[in-house]
Amino acid sequence: MNFNNVFRWHLPFLFLMLMTFRAAAADTLLILGDSLSAGYRMAANAAWPALLNDKWQSRASVVNGSISGDTSQQGLSRLPALLKQHQPRWVLVELGGNDGLRGFQPQQTEQTLRTILQTIKAANAQPLLMQIRLPANYGRRYNEAFSAIYPKLAKEFDIPLLPFFMEEVYLKPQWMQDDGIHPNRDAQPFIADWMATRLAPLVKHDSSNS
């Protein structure tokens, strides 16, 4: 057997396999969030990003970079290492809720989120932004100023703005933890399905991005 001929015959196939593997490896969706995505008081594999990853095995690898209690500034401080480690193609930003709950100035949160989006773009990844809303008892003026951050940034960066999934969860008291803030384990499959529907048109493969 002429091994040189065999090697030459298989080389294009091996190259194609390598490029396919590299492309697949690059198709990662990173979730940069707080306790709403981290799976507060539950195992990590029960949280909605893990369920979405199970559902999306052929579409994208979902990496949950969320940490309970994170403010937008804390998310920003972790972002460069996450981008370097996972080299995601898309990054969903679900941050700001803890800023609002702690009474941070909306302008401060806006600027931090702006820096997050700039950092993602600089890493050649596609940022996706989630609308965040606060409980009504934080006052109309503060709530309006806070909520306005997200559509403003989405327009500024020309990026998708996803609805706040918790607005659906709040309608089902049986899906809420005792603190009235966090979704419980029973809510996670619904959130995963809800997010899958809204992310599917955004997290897709095309030849222009290959």
Where are these regions (language model features)?
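Bacterial N-terminal signal peptides that target proteins for export
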Residues: 1-11
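A detector of low-complexity, intrinsically disordered, Ser/Thr/Gly/Pro/Ala-rich segments
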Residues: 2-4, 17-18, 26, 89
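Alpha-helical cap/lid subdomain in secreted, periplasmic
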Residues: 3-5, 76-210
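Bacterial N-terminal signal peptides
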Residues: 10-20
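Serine-esterase "nucleophile elbow" of acetyl-processing enzymes
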Residues: 23-87
